[in-house]
């Protein structure tokens, strides 16, 4: 568990990154290989199925994150041209990052911020319909220093980042009409001559590099890549929700809490969630009305789930420790309400369903704690009922949770560093694209079954559905402010027994305060 790890081991885990030096081999290792053996054993014992390096979910999903926050080298800052014209001076106040490899970008190419190297690589791959094979099962990390190591994973990353192959085809038609079908810009091969990239051995096998024909296989579909990533984050979600501490560990924690009350700093609690509470099995039944103890136990269990969920997400681990804490402090409340709202739909109870078999009723006379602001009724009406009407599937629920975590409200995340703000914005947009592809595919299938084979109709249905889901985002945020008011009023009016105020309520209140 994290409490038994040294500070250096924790930094090792949270700051893991893949770095290649000059003359290194072509194998892109797992980030787990940079963690000490002792640390791996501790993580394997504490989080089997999530942090275990042998777990398919960890290995597979861990390598899908884009290194969008990597710093570029000094040499890349001296380029003064763009992909749209020669001799154009770069605005020194703009620091765009290529969403594929993390190098410096000079503008948007095919729909995303991309460097000239990735722009040319993507265009050549689409024009010539090139097929690549990865020797390492598609698990290579793509970064500026070694982006040529694996063309297969680099092309896949281009699709995942949102590059549009239709824009490439349109450009080719335009060039052919202008009488220069084979014209190639010099920046197409700029990345091949860069000292930062030429020292790395190319390990990718090329299946097909001939011009495309009617019989050639199609390029990997963006929709297929998005669907694959969606499946992987759902697997991660299931693994985190299914983890349970041993019974002896839970009993020892209960005995300890009976004799100790202490104020725990948010940062310590987040990186050591076992200090807050044990990982009990999630009991989503709502079979009994909640007591005061049930309410406080729910906050603790949900916080442990929140900590496990965020720290299992590669996109979150790419942030600095400072930015991680800022984001976590501002997202605990939204995470809690989104999970409870979906549990309420699953259990079918009229109130706020908890993870311990209890529910907090929306009727005032049945409440163990006065709901001064009516947050339980607000959650039921503004979240649970719309979720039930939309009939969200598991993938939509998980992707919406990721969108909620990485929503970039300026006022809430003002304390993030500039790099952190850009990372949150880019990752949030990527999760929105994943949600759009999933919803569009789902709605299109239903339209086909109903005899409506028009793509425009499907996209229209998907847009309406996503718009309704985005409304739920604002409803979740509103509930956070109501909850904060409730906690402050409970403490002032002394409506909660003092033994709970010493630890749980104080900690909950601290989670809404800025660093």
Swiss-Prot record:
Family statement: Belongs to the nuclear hormone receptor family.
Chain residue ranges for the region called AF-2: 498-509
DNA-binding region: 95-170
Organism field: Caenorhabditis elegans
Coiled coil keyword on record: no
A biological process from GO: regulation of DNA-templated transcription
Name of this protein: Nuclear hormone receptor family member nhr-62
First-listed, main subcellular location of the protein, grouped into a coarse class: nucleus
Domain NR LBD: 225-509
Zinc fingers, NR C4-type class: 98-118, 134-153
InterPro entries to which the protein is assigned, alphabetical: C.elegans_NHRs, HNF4-like_DBD, NHR-like_dom_sf, Nucl_hrmn_rcpt_lig-bd, Nuclear_hrmn_rcpt, Znf_hrmn_rcpt, Znf_NHR/GATA
Sequence segments annotated as region (Disordered): 169-195
Job description of the protein: Orphan nuclear hormone receptor. Required for metabolic and physiologic responses associated with dietary-restriction-induced longevity. Modulates triglyceride and lipid metabolism and autophagy, associated with dietary-restriction, probably acting via regulation of transcription of target genes.
GO cellular component, one term: nucleus
Disruption phenotype: RNAi-mediated knockdown suppresses the longevity caused by an eat-2 mutant background.
Sample GO molecular function, one term: DNA-binding transcription factor activity
Cellular location(s): Nucleus
Tissue specificity note: Widely expressed at a low level in many tissues including the pharynx, sensory neurons, intestine, spermatheca, hypodermis, and excretory cell.
Transmembrane segments: none
The encoding gene: nhr-62
UniProt keywords, alphabetically: DNA-binding, Metal-binding, Nucleus, Receptor, Transcription, Transcription regulation, Zinc, Zinc-finger
